[in-house]
Amino acid sequence: MARDFPLERVRNIGIAAHIDAGKTTTTERILFYSGVVHKIGEVHDGAAVTDWMAQERERGITITAAAISTSWQDHRINIIDTPGHVDFTIEVERSMRVLDGVIAVFCAVGGVQPQSETVWRQADRYSVPRMVFVNKMDRTGADFLKVNQQIKDRLKANAFPIQLPIGAEGDLSGIIDLVSNKAYLYKNDLGTDIEEAPIPDEMKDEALEWRSKLMESVAENDEELIEIFLDKGELTEDQLKKGIREGVLKHGLVPVLCGSAFKNKGVQLVLDAVVDYLPAPIDVKPIQGVLPNGKEDVRPSDDNAPFSALAFKVMSDPYGKLTFVRMYSGVLSKGSYVMNSTKDAKERISRLVILKADEREEVDELRAGDLGAVLGLKNTTTGDTLCNTDDPIVLETLFIPEPVISVAVEPKTKGDMEKLSKALQALSEEDPTFRVSTDQETNQTVIAGMGELHLEILVDRMLREFKVEANIGAPQVSYRETIRSSSKGEGKYARQTGGKGQYGHVVIEMEPAEVGKGFEFVNKIVGGTVPKEYIGPASNGMKETCESGVLAGYPLIDVKVTLVDGSFHDVDSSEMAFKIAGSMAFKDGVKKCNPVLLEPMMKVEVESPDDFLGSVIGDLSSRRGQVEGQSVDDGLSKVQAKVPLAEMFGYATQLRSMTQGRGIFSMEFANYEEVPRNVAEAIISKNQGNS
């Protein structure tokens, strides 16, 4: 089957931003103007196409990354609309991993918000080229050039306007395109009647000034263009487009556009810019992976290369399990068998679909560069690689942050017990930041996630989708433990009970691992002192012991264990004996490695009238907060601080009373840090008292 669109005419893009910048509305307009939907859906009416879960439509926020295909100017555009709420940061993370380009949407009034910085960092982590759409130009207080400057200052990006608004706030009537040097005037409310016109006289000087700056900025990044610019003093429209595209692909330039998606102004020009400036799959670096022999290899974006794809999202719905994949190379056909190289398991591809939000179009194959979904995969979870059985490779996976908050959950009736475990299994398969565990002391089921809203939505889904009635406990902070020094540990398990005994013996070296590594295991056994078949069980025993640390029973993270020695018995040794010996050695070593308690630190930004600045800072300091920055602009103060999550419960109520209801704040996870000794002692003694 031939391709619908050649690879150079495919764009895999994400639309990302902070809450309320208007991402979903922008996506809706893109779908309307490109012909996917024939009626405009509004977020506040609960009718947006990409907000397809019941909770999204009720709350007017996007929770999951919905993938949609559309076309514009003979190009296939695959769009992922990502959530702006920090509790759903994994959705942004997983979409950034599989995209080739991003439209970052900013509010023309609010400008750069804390969540914008998070999204920008995530795009940086995966080196995703991007462009900016400054939305909501129709709102009171909209200031296009001020937002452009904020992007330069706060995000350290070489942002450059390639458009200017004609009028602002209620008088937004059109847009000047600095590249084509033309004005586009909107003649009807639907944004379908657009007049191409000369630039209005009163804006000619401003447009000329910005166009000259744009030509200079573009020429600086390209030797060929700088010669033309120095020789002729200007660049043609085609030369400008070529230069902007090169700048975007090399991460040297971020073009900034403007408009109002809600008022139907500027969206078609955004689509034009996606086609003109954002990369095709063949414009970005080939995906890297590791071969079975441990060597690195790359897979080019080519239908003729061996098949490889990354599963970036798993979803359960009434029709079964849906696994979203990004095709990196080769062709995936319906009915074929493939290899999950991450889990070393064979999978059958029963059906393939391309999605238009909650509508599906069945296809016979997916090709390099496509975003699609597979039905019928049994063992594949988020971050797994799918590939040819003859050409195995494991692709780079996703960065998955540690959860920061947990609650106990128990079924209301015995009949709900089985339904609860099925629901929790399905939800944790979908969302790697959602963890399920059992509290050893109370035997309660504990669920952990990225924030209160995250857990609230998941509990809501249990009720709606799985019909589980459950009681939920009060939120608890997800502490962690780690080690600060190195040591040796030894575990010898020897039991003689009548006939056959049990014998396992291991010696390990323990040291702190890099942050984010979790549990790292290295085997340095030589001469067969521990046979190969017992190394896995010994490692598993240590890994399981990590789940409950030595200080207060919290999971132990960022620990490197090297197996250096041991002994075995020809008759009495078994996998179970070595698993127990591994656990004993781990416990022995940890106690000597200066274990410490870690707590989640949150990046908090508070906005309030500047009269309350002193009270806000004083209150944050009393919560063990470290103020990292503050500014006052137009009578509004902004304070950035890092505060332990444990101190932030009930903060919204306190802030309201402190600022007479005029203060707002945003909060997102920053990192784990060591708990001060006096606070740690109280937490440890409380936990030991409960055990």
From Swiss-Prot:
Gene3D superfamilies: 3.30.230.10, 3.30.70.240, Elongation Factor G (Translational Gtpase), domain 3 (3.30.70.870), P-loop containing nucleotide triphosphate hydrolases (3.40.50.300), Translation factors (2.40.30.10). SUPFAM superfamilies: EF-G C-terminal domain-like, P-loop containing nucleoside triphosphate hydrolases, Ribosomal protein S5 domain 2-like, Translation proteins. One of its GO terms (biological process) is ribosome disassembly. One of its GO terms (molecular function) is GTP binding. The keyword Magnesium does not apply. This is Elongation factor G. Belongs to the TRAFAC class translation factor GTPase superfamily. Classic translation factor GTPase family. EF-G/EF-2 subfamily. Catalyzes the GTP-dependent ribosomal translocation step during translation elongation. During this step, the ribosome changes from the pre-translocational (PRE) to the post-translocational (POST) state as the newly formed A-site-bound peptidyl-tRNA and P-site-bound deacylated tRNA move to the P and E sites, respectively. Catalyzes the coordinated movement of the two tRNA molecules, the mRNA and conformational changes in the ribosome. GTP binds at residues 17-24, 81-85, 135-138. It is found in: Cytoplasm. The gene is fusA. Residues 8-282 form the tr-type G domain. Keywords: Cytoplasm, Elongation factor, GTP-binding, Nucleotide-binding, Protein biosynthesis. It comes from Prochlorococcus marinus subsp. pastoris (strain CCMP1986 / NIES-2087 / MED4).
